[in-house]
Amino acid sequence: MLGKEPRESLQPQRLDYLNEGLALERQGDFEAALTSYRLAFRDNPSDSRILLNMAIAFTKTGQPEEAIRHYKRALELDPSLVGAHYGVAFLLLKRGDAQQAAEHLRAFLARPPKGPDAERWIRHAESALRDIASSPAQETL
């Protein structure tokens, strides 16, 4: 074995693109995070968490329509994904689709998350739903 590495070390390493994307997102590099998420999704096309993270990154890069599309795709894979209901609701509300936003807010509130920040998100969703319900254009809801 003159100067040769053992055969095992020549095996390609499988990268964890999801964790790489999360790390890049924490650093504020959302474009690079999206690239990593795309690679992760290519390897795991049924992982709704990857689509959720892509939607968040699209939101942070000012691409709300792409974010909405990815949130909805994540919900097709996992309808109980409360983070996707929350995220898409507020994008739909900004777009002016209050009725569809209300449906997602109700789905979010039906199975609210747990954890240290959960109460803030729950209050925000409840407030938005009240605002939608009291809006003159939404009296037919």
Q: Where do the language-model regions lie?
A:
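Conserved structural position within tetratricopeptide repeats
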Residues: 39-42, 72-76, 110
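TPR/TPR-like (Sel1-like) alpha-helical repeat modules
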Residues: 90-116, 123, 127-130
